[in-house]
UniProtKB/Swiss-Prot annotation:
<dbReference type="InterPro" id="IPR051734">
    <property type="entry name" value="VapB_TA_antitoxins"/>
</dbReference>
<dbReference type="InterPro" id="IPR007159">
    <property type="entry name" value="SpoVT-AbrB_dom"/>
</dbReference>
<feature type="domain" description="SpoVT-AbrB">
    <location>
        <begin position="4"/>
        <end position="44"/>
    </location>
</feature>
<dbReference type="InterPro" id="IPR037914">
    <property type="entry name" value="SpoVT-AbrB_sf"/>
</dbReference>
<protein>
    <recommendedName>
        <fullName>Virulence-associated protein B</fullName>
    </recommendedName>
</protein>
<dbReference type="InterPro" id="IPR047976">
    <property type="entry name" value="Anti_VapB2-like"/>
</dbReference>
<comment type="similarity">
    <text>Belongs to the VapB family.</text>
</comment>
<keyword id="KW-0843">Virulence</keyword>
<keyword id="KW-0238">DNA-binding</keyword>
<dbReference type="GO" id="GO:0003677">
    <property type="term" value="F:DNA binding"/>
</dbReference>
<dbReference type="Pfam" id="PF04014">
    <property type="entry name" value="MazE_antitoxin"/>
</dbReference>
Length: 76
């Protein structure tokens, strides 16, 4: 796992992104997840997914019936 440096520039906090992780774009979407953040290129296929995540309530849980264990034969 790589480590990036966090620093302050003016009134903003910034992260020095290692070369292997640099973006090929001028803008990114930023999304907070718990105590972490996710950066995705602005013009990415993930943009719609991230927008959809914002529609869920913070305490959203999927309720479902417990799975019944399946008995299967060995594959080989």
């Amino acid at each position: 796992m790589k480590v990036a440096k966090v620093f302050t520039t003016g009134r903003s906090q910034a992260v020095r992104i290692p070369k292997a992780f640099q973006f090929d774009t001028k803008e990114v979407i930023i999304q907070r997840f718990g105590n972490g953040i996710l950066l995705i290129p602005k013009n990415s296929d993930w943009q719609g997914f991230l927008e959809a995540l914002n529609e869920f309530e913070p305490d959203f849980k999927i309720e479902r019936e417990p799975q019944i264990e399946q008995v299967r034969e060995d594959f080989l």
